[in-house]
């Protein structure tokens, strides 16, 4: 079965959360990449501040590790308000959400990560809170139970999700500002790596930052994780400075190739090429061939390979593209 701690997985692992917090930009002007999103946010935030209003509710969605939590914190900083953070699975009962809402001050940001995992009971409480800044709660039980409304101060709900399609339509419709985060280009990732190295007090040159960036799968969280491992290699095997030579050898040692693929990515592509003549191959057959569950292939391995154009998902099954053959220096049969 697939390792839970693949070096190039975008989900949080180990000390990621602590390190990410230390390296997070605090303001939009410090934030690198996502140019369209950044430009939109600058306008929305300035308009809300000019009107002395709470910012409209915001849904941030996209693959993991791209900075959804960071953006939520930047919004609070730019608005000059407090932020309270939680996640969908934590809010099990209506009372859990009510406790958070009643402790908000005017203009505050409530950040809910994995908002697609909210229970229906909690979601029902959220609707009037988002629309009318009111909280409907039940007092008492049985025939004596009655509903009362509590007024809430204007606040901004920022929801984050990797699966926007899993949100119910009523919840999705209540977000006035939907923002999609895209994978980062190598230039922006190089800037992020350089900034993180400065925060960590590391010596790194432009080529060293580029080498780490191009193997980071378009994801800042992976870039920062690889930077920490390259630092270890540089300190033990060299003088601590990160150059292209040092980064290249460190990442080769870590089995992260020039495209950011690891053993499992290559195993999947080679199974399609060698065992199924390039495809198409059904998901169940592919899962059996590489000894993985179909959900692991769909949710963990495939997305980046498809996004980068190395495999295709068709009605008849998975196909290895010409780019996959080129990666292994093979000739795609006609």
From Swiss-Prot:
- SMART domains per the record? AAA (SM00382)
Q: What is its EC number?
A: 3.6.4.-
Residues reported to bind ATP: 24, 65, 68-70, 131-133, 174, 184, 221
An example Gene Ontology molecular-function term:
ATP binding
Q: Which residues of this UniProt protein bind DNA? A: 294, 313, 318
Residues that bind Mg(2+): 69
Q: Which sequence ranges are marked TM in the entry?
A: none
Primary subcellular site in the record, as a coarse category: cytoplasm
- CC annotations in GO: cytoplasm; Holliday junction resolvase complex
An example GO biological process term is:
DNA repair
Q: Where is this region: Small ATPAse domain (RuvB-S)?
A: 185-255
Tell me the segments the record calls region Head domain (RuvB-H).
Answer: 258-334
Give compartment(s): Cytoplasm
UniProt key word Nucleotide-binding:
yes
NCBIfam families cross-referenced by the UniProt entry? PRK00080.1, ruvB
Subunit info here reads:
Homohexamer. Forms an RuvA(8)-RuvB(12)-Holliday junction (HJ) complex. HJ DNA is sandwiched between 2 RuvA tetramers; dsDNA enters through RuvA and exits via RuvB. An RuvB hexamer assembles on each DNA strand where it exits the tetramer. Each RuvB hexamer is contacted by two RuvA subunits (via domain III) on 2 adjacent RuvB subunits; this complex drives branch migration. In the full resolvosome a probable DNA-RuvA(4)-RuvB(12)-RuvC(2) complex forms which resolves the HJ.
Identify the PANTHER family for this entry.
Answer: HOLLIDAY JUNCTION BRANCH MIGRATION COMPLEX SUBUNIT RUVB, PTHR42848
Tell me what this protein is called.
Answer: Holliday junction branch migration complex subunit RuvB
Q: Which organism is it from?
A: Shewanella putrefaciens (strain CN-32 / ATCC BAA-453)
